[in-house]
Amino acid sequence: MNQPFIIYLKNKLTSRFEYSRNVKYVTLLNNGYRITFTNGRSYNYGADRVKYYPFLYSQNNVRIYVRGKLLSEYSTVDNYGAYLIFRHGNFSSSPFDKNNDIEICSIKQDVIKEKTVFDYFRQILQSIGETSFDIPTDENKNPNQISADILLKALDNIDLYESRSALSNYLAGKNPAVRTLYDTIIYPFGCNESQKKAVEASLRNSLSIIEGPPGTGKTQTILNIVANLIVQNKTVAIVSNNNSAVFNVRDKLEGLGYGIFVASLGNKENKETFFETLKEYPISDNFKISTKRLQDAEKNIIELNSILNLCFQNRNKLATLKTKLLDAEVEFGHLITEQPLNSKIKLDLDKKFYRKLDSNKALKLKYLLLKIEPDNKLSFITKLRLIFQYGLIDLNTLDEYSDELVTYVNHKFYELYIEDIKNDIQRIEEWLISHDEKENLNRFIEVSKDIFNVFLFRKYKQLAQISFGVNNYISQFDDFIKHYPVILSSTLSLHTSIPKGFLFDYLIIDESSQVDIIKSALCFSCSRNVVVVGDSMQLTHIVDEQSKATAEAFQKEYNISPAYDYVRHNILNSLKSLYAENIKSVLLKEHYRCHPIIIGFCNKKYYNNELVVMTGGDNHPFKIIETNIAGGRGNYNQRQIDETDFYIRENYFGKYDKVGIIAPYRNHANKLQQQMPEGAEADTIHKFQGREKDAIIFNTVKNNINQFIDNPNLINVAVSRAVKEFIVVMPESMELPHGTNIGDLIRYMYYTTNLNDTIVKGNISSVFDLLYKEYNRVFISFLSSNKNIGGSAAEIIMHKLLNEKILPNNPLYSSIDMVREYRLRDLVRNLQLFEDDVAQFIRRNSRIDFLLYNKIDKTPVLAIEVDGVSFHSNELQQERDRKKDYVLKTIGLPLLRLSTEGHNEEQRIIESLNEAMGLKN
């Protein structure tokens, strides 16, 4: 039962107020109190000698933590304002000052779900014997694996009634409310627009995700998060599945002079190494700055933050424009090759226009020209538009240059579009120079360092030097964590590096796509807040087929939510599945590693063109070495090894350490390493994640694309390791189906390379994506039958079916895009293949309703025609349809005709598209 009050009486000798347990009654007097003690005696006290606190309220069924330690003997808190008394039944504590050292949490009433998930985890560990492969390969099914005994013991020690940890929120599917940011966020390690957003999101949210594609500065972002947590007196653990990732963080901090607050713990060997080499040095006087300089820094950082936000926005616009320019120039190069225009004719046509076109007007002119039937007279309105809107002086030009005029407009569009981009680039570059972008960023970093350094100086000047060792640091952990608020560890060993029950303020999981959910759950139990850093398009944790079947059976047995599926999800994907839109996720967009054309493939294929490429490069970065021998046996290919060896010795003599050779199979990688010159490094892709080389050589080994070597995560990582050059060694006979990762990669390499050297002339032209995407925009604006989509009712339905359902909802079609009203003349490279009447039909602006194409290399894949019943029963239209069918058959482009009276269109499109792509239905 609670006491009605607590009372402190002033000791006459010490003049200190002391808690008195033996007071029975208190009576308020005019000038003080009359106090009756439990022995029956009463005394009067002046008001200056008494502190009286009446009972306010109780909290029952609670857990009480003092300085992070659970007081398990108490379950109720009585609140007296400035003081708290803890009790269980009639057993009570002395009063505690109400302060930040005390945490009061409601006891969880139901942990059935949590226990079920943990039972599922235990069954996996007990039956499979371990968690996931360290070195996954195709042919080696039994590599060294992490001992499950450590994990099972750790699971048994986790307190599922602990409600303060991130594990509690993760298992309950809760994400606590967003917090208010500190007034000053610092970036002593530099930043860009995305990194600033990521740091702020991490500090505001209890659970957050940072998606960091290759070369986007994940480590720099982590360092800035750490700096802000330190100045807020927070503790942080940084973990990864392997030591190399966290050691990278350590090396960066030590290299910049900030090793003073970092402890590299984890397994026994790491701990021993850390404490054996531990030397406490006094904080450097270089970190000390004047009060005036600190005040200036705190003022300037706010002003610079606003300026830099604008600078970052414009810097990203500039990079995006440069990527658009590169794409436009490559596409224009294809147009010049596939739709050549005589320079004299071009000059003559230039003179026919008295008004200069712009790129948008060129597209509108193309639309108008496509609507003109060659044998029909021009309407008066059309003549006026040609003369006054587009500046065409001589209307006889339409007849004189009937074959060349649309090609001329196509060329003109690219010239003007490229000119527009170059003008925009120049304008933004001038803006950035005038606003001192680089100088302001450097000042921003310097003032951030000033604030960070002075905090460290003041903190470490006050800390007493203590001798910590591997055998005593746990017993002195309160002091240890003050000296070393940043702990580095593997995910497996974090819980063994800290006292039981200790919670970090923050946990950062790096390379999270490789971390399974069991080890993640253990780490979550050690922290209040979590930042998960990784890339869902890179390598994930690996589970062998036998273990996968066992784990899937347990999932069904325990009825486990898909979000906690050990087989399907690493921790990054688990959080996405669990929280969907209810977790803050920031994509680091700015890419700083690869040649623009190299990362361009990854950007288009895997990142939905969201990356902002900050690199440059004048060289062409791709090479394809074709061998005339097909795939080898035993998962290796000696001819590819020989070709790789020859190329390296010819092109990288004396620079062998700049080259990495990647193979999908361990056997091939081992034989590569045996034959390569010293310094060149050959391995499977799993050893290259998180690293980079000037040149990467990828050996396909096989001559057919199978599921193992065509893994999208593997190809993405392989390509994005290359800084300057990416080379593929492959059999000449290798088929390249649309939609496969290797197929699209090779197609992209051919598409972007030197046209004269590598493009094999066939009968089908590439799709001019930019021209028709922009043209479709103008085309739609001309039509009023629908606010968003133009065309007949049937075409509108088909547009929505393709664009909103079929293409976006099937991962197999991630590289397929669509254009409308595509001109046959833009598809047919060689008119000499056809008789005069068919060639004339092609020239007469005949079009395909829908063209599906591979957006990686612009190759046409499938044509779709929507046939109205009454219209297409017309004899003249039937003749046109026959000619169109013949043309498409001749150039080898599959055609699907859909009738407005047909049915099951969606399934027919999917079947036809799969067949055209070489996929099995």
Regions found by a protein language model. Name each.
Residues 1-188, 280-292, 306, 320, ...:
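Accessory, charged alpha-helical segments in nucleic-acid-processing enzymes
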Residues 1-62, 66, 260, 267-272, ...:
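Charged C-terminal transducer/switch regions of large nucleotide-driven machines
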Residues 88-97, 104-105, 175-288, 346-360, ...:
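ASCE P-loop NTPase helicase motor core
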Residues 109, 117-190, 357, 362-503:
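Conserved helicase NTPase catalytic core signature
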Residues 502-508, 691-702, 725-728:
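A short beta-strand element within the Helicase C-terminal
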Residues 546-586, 619, 680, 705-814:
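Helicase C-terminal subdomain and adjacent C-terminal extension
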Residues 609-675:
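Conserved helicase/translocase motor-coupling segment
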Residues 763-921:
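Nucleic-acid endo/exonuclease domains
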